Regions:
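Conserved RNP beta-strands of RNA recognition motif
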Residues: 52-56
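Short S/T/G/P-rich N-terminal loop/turn motif that feeds into the first structured element of a domain
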Residues: 1-49, 59-67, 80-105
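A common structural junction motif
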Residues: 72-77
Length: 105
């Protein structure tokens, strides 16, 4: 399992409310991405950066997603190149679902 942290700078013209509304509008579309597991949409408390913490089944599925139309949309909407950092996910603990489990290789 792969966790990807994606960050991009927000233009000053995009307000917190606009960012929130946009995230809510696009969230369902991620469910169709091959290899996608979960995304947490994130917004810096100072309003300067936004992005996501994604979970993917494989590194290949993550890289394929970020090199497709998604990247063009980010560049067009925010006017900058996102930073993407990939991590191997060794374990997950989730209070909401009451689970904690290791990721098997």
């Amino acid at each position: 399992m792969i966790t990807a942290i994606v960050l991009y700078e927000l233009p000053q013209s995009i307000t917190r409310q606009q960012c929130l509304a946009h995230f809510h509008r696009i969230a369902p579309g991620f469910l169709e991405a091959p290899g996608f597991i979960r995304k947490q949409f994130i917004y810096a408390v100072d309003g300067k950066v936004a992005g996501g913490a994604y979970m993917w089944k494989t590194l290949e599925s993550a890289k394929a997603f970020y090199s497709g139309p998604w990247l063009d949309c980010i560049r067009e909407r925010y006017g900058n190149q996102p930073t993407i950092t990939y991590f191997e996910t060794f374990a997950v603990a989730d209070q909401k679902d009451g689970v904690s489990y290791p990721i098997r290789e």
